[in-house]
Amino acid sequence: MKHLIDKANTLMEALPYIRRFSGRTFVIKYGGHAMSDERLKESFALDVIMLKSLGINAVIVHGGGPQINETLKRYGIVSEFVRGMRVTDGETMSVVEMVLVGQVNKEVVGYLNQHGGKAVGLCGKDGSLLLSKKLLQEVTGEDGAIEQIDIGYVGDVVKVNTDLIKTLEQGGYLPVIAPVGVGLAGESYNINADVVAGRVAAALNAEKLILLTDTPGVLDKDKQLIQKISVAQMHRLIEDESITGGMIPKVVCCAEALNDGVKKAHIIDGRMEHSVLLEIFTDVGIGTEITK
């Protein structure tokens, strides 16, 4: 009997959040181990479909780094990286677009639909969804001066066509976006998926930006989870090197989205089943909540 009461209490705990977020938009960056483990893929799909059934508009932006690496290796193309950014020449961009748009995007859409969703796959070229420009990478030269170098078809989002996303949402569809942007001349750009998610969330004035990662969330120097943090506190933790490495661009992406109007950002562990529901509909959550 107790386990039944516990289930009822869990449902009651979720009730105020369901009421608060119905009709709002969540932008979720889907990536990491959650995209490769079959059990986690099913869990994520069910979480997203649950959000939609509760009246929450979920917009998915997915990554695909491992799949890109595997395909480039198969084609014998060696990648060069500058400060973590893939140098993307024309040949590499063709492979990136093929993998993200033609393979990964369709896999995510198919999985959501298989589990009862109405997902529609998009990339930045569809309806000029992600109008983009070339991103120049800053590096420090031998003389200590900051230089900007061209790393090919790597871009940043200039404008998001929210009309297309809103039209799909109103029809009950789940937009699934591949992080490939389009330039003014129709050229394709490879864009960091976290950045795309942040820009889309800001353009939609989203309630939440949620990044699925392969860590529990933002950790302190003792490797303990920080459950709640403000942007100001986050910058201090970067300065004292509590936050380092690959987590820095993720928290910076969240900070930019918050400054541009997103209400809250969350960095959560995508390796945990139903991580999205546990973060949103429980009082404690399972990851890090970032506020302005």
UniProtKB/Swiss-Prot annotation:
It catalyses: N-acetyl-L-glutamate + ATP = N-acetyl-L-glutamyl 5-phosphate + ADP. Pathway: Amino-acid biosynthesis; L-arginine biosynthesis; N(2)-acetyl-L-ornithine from L-glutamate: step 2/4. Gene3D superfamilies: Acetylglutamate kinase-like (3.40.1160.10). Its EC number is 2.7.2.8. Keywords: Amino-acid biosynthesis, Arginine biosynthesis, ATP-binding, Cytoplasm, Kinase, Nucleotide-binding, Transferase. The record marks K29, K250 as: Transition state stabilizer. It comes from the Bacteria. Substrate binds at G64, G65, R86, N190. GO terms for biological process: arginine biosynthetic process via ornithine; L-arginine biosynthetic process. Its main location: cytoplasm. GO terms for cellular component: cytoplasm. InterPro entries: AceGlu_kinase-like_sf (IPR036393), AcgluKinase_fam (IPR004662), ArgB (IPR037528), Asp/Glu/Uridylate_kinase (IPR001048), Glu/AcGlu_kinase (IPR001057), NAGK-C (IPR041727). It is found in: Cytoplasm. The keyword Nucleotide-binding applies. The keyword Iron does not apply. One of its GO terms (molecular function) is acetylglutamate kinase activity. It is an enzyme of class 2 (transferase). Belongs to the acetylglutamate kinase family. ArgB subfamily. HAMAP family: ArgB (MF_00082). Catalyzes the ATP-dependent phosphorylation of N-acetyl-L-glutamate. This is Acetylglutamate kinase.
